[in-house]
Structure formats: structure tokens, C-alpha cells
């Protein structure tokens, strides 16, 4: 998260917690026409999977946070507030969240290049809270990344395990019709009748 997003997350987290929910993280996206402030919320880990986040939860958080933002005013200018569930491709914002999803695949964008790359995709192998690092397995190679160097990260869902992978066609591929080769290239094209 950016410094601005971190400050806003620290400001809003107690409000979200008071509603019995968890603030996973905040995205602050400035733009010339107005910024977007996106909050990702979820039910506390202890209540999962019995309870899931729903539209009513998002609406409650939106109302409360909106009122708080009007009073605190941490964003100058116009902005749009979005409150969302994390979804299956959930974003990851901190070491604790990476640790929760150890063994899963993630897509990561780095702030600064590491080994000549800013993007990597691999399995979350381990986290080291003391060192502030996350170890990924990328193309069968161990890659250690500082949590401070992560700009964005998202879980890469296992669509097959979720039962949502597209099925592969079986059998031979359908044959395409052959182009008509009976006409001679010297014959003039048929003329369309003109309306008069």
C-alpha cells in the first residue's frame, strides 16, 4: 500500500472492526477527475467459512466510513469510495495475509525491480516477520522479496480446484469447410441488380 493508503487504512480500521468486520487493506488511486478510494473488507478469520461478506456488510461499512471521512477529511478534492469483498483473487496487503495464504500462488508487482524484473508469479513458500520478507517459488527457483518492495499482490486462484476451469474439448477438432475452388478466376464477378 502507498503511504497515503496506509494512513487511511490506519484511520478507518477501528471503524470497520467496530462493525464486526476486518479491513484487509486500502487502495488509493489518485486521478485528475477525482481519486478512487477502495476498501477491501472481510469477516474475521475466526468466523470463516461459516460467514461470508455480503452486500449489506459493504453498505454498512460504506455509510460509516463515509461519515468518518467527511469529518476527518484525509483526502483533498473529489473522490469515489468503493467498498468491496476481496473475491477469489484477493489482494494481499501485509505479511500476515501472505502467511495466511502460504502454499497458494500469487501475482506480485514490485516497486523497484529485483533481478531485472518488476513482476513475478509464484507460490508463497514462507514469510519471515523479523526480516520483513516473503519467499516465493518462481519457475522452481526461490525468490526472497522484501515486503516493503511490494507494490501490489493478488492471489492467483486455482480454477480447477474451485471447479471453475473451462473444460477442454475432447475428440478431433471440427473441420472447417473448404473454400469453393470450382469458379474460374477469369470469370467476372456476378453483378448485383440495381434498384431503380
Swiss-Prot record:
GO biological process, alphabetically ordered: ribosomal small subunit assembly; translation
Chain segments carrying region Disordered: 163-196
Subcellular location: Cytoplasm
Pfam families tied to this protein: DUF150_C (PF17384), RimP_N (PF02576)
A cellular-component GO term for this protein: cytosol
Stated family: Belongs to the RimP family.
Full protein name: Ribosome maturation factor RimP
Organism in which the protein naturally occurs: Stenotrophomonas maltophilia (strain K279a)
Amino acid at each position: 500500500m502507498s503511504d497515503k493508503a496506509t494512513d487511511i487504512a490506519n484511520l478507518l480500521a477501528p471503524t470497520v472492526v467496530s462493525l464486526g468486520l476486518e479491513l484487509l487493506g486500502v487502495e488509493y488511486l489518485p486521478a485528475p477527475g477525482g481519486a478512487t478510494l477502495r476498501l477491501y473488507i472481510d469477516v474475521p478469520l475466526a468466523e470463516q467459512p461459516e460467514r461470508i461478506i455480503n452486500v449489506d456488510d459493504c453498505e454498512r461499512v460504506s455509510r460509516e466510513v463515509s461519515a468518518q471521512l467527511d469529518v476527518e477529511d484525509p483526502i483533498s478534492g473529489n473522490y469515489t469510495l468503493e467498498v468491496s469483498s476481496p473475491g477469489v483473487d484477493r489482494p494481499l496487503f501485509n505479511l500476515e495475509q501472505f502467511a495466511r495464504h502460504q502454499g497458494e500462488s500469487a501475482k506480485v508487482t514490485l516497486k523497484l525491480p529485483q533481478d531485472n524484473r518488476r513482476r513475478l508469479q509464484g507460490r508463497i513458500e514462507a514469510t519471515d516477520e523479523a526480516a520483513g520478507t516473503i519467499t516465493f517459488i518462481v519457475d522452481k527457483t526461490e525468490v526472497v522479496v522484501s515486503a516493503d518492495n511490494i507494490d501490489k499482490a493478488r492471489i492467483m486462484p486455482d480454477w480447477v480446484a474451485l471447479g471453475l476451469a473451462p473444460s477442454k474439448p475432447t475428440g478431433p477438432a471440427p473441420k472447417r469447410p473448404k473454400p469453393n475452388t470450382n469458379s474460374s478466376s477469369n470469370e467476372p464477378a456476378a453483378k448485383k441488380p440495381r434498384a431503380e
